[in-house]
């Protein structure tokens, strides 16, 4: 009987901490993402919704450049589950040079931040990236 109680308690307590979360990000009318810096845990999912037309998600960098998520279609719902800790940079393909960028920080891990900062961007996008990095680091 004690074993059953222990197992029940263990399952309840461990499942309480193992649920992955889903974050919702919308494409906005002002050519930005509704959440510009998303801080998530390993195993969490981000869903991008086309609340405004003419936008998509294209990853420019992450902890492993060889296995970045594929670019989404324009005006399409898009979902990515993040299983590798680190910093991910993405933009809207048509509006990236105008600063439509987003950062995902997985597991509060900034080990690849220098690689992200080294990605070639327009002057406007580089300025936006620096602002997003300051936001991410101030909340860590």
What are the language-model segments listed below?
Residues 1-6:
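Positively charged n-region of N-terminal signal peptides that target proteins for export
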Residues 10-11:
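Sec-dependent N-terminal signal peptides of Gram-positive bacterial secreted proteins and lipoproteins
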Residues 18-140:
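Extracytoplasmic copper-binding redox domains, predominantly the cupredoxin/blue-copper superfamily
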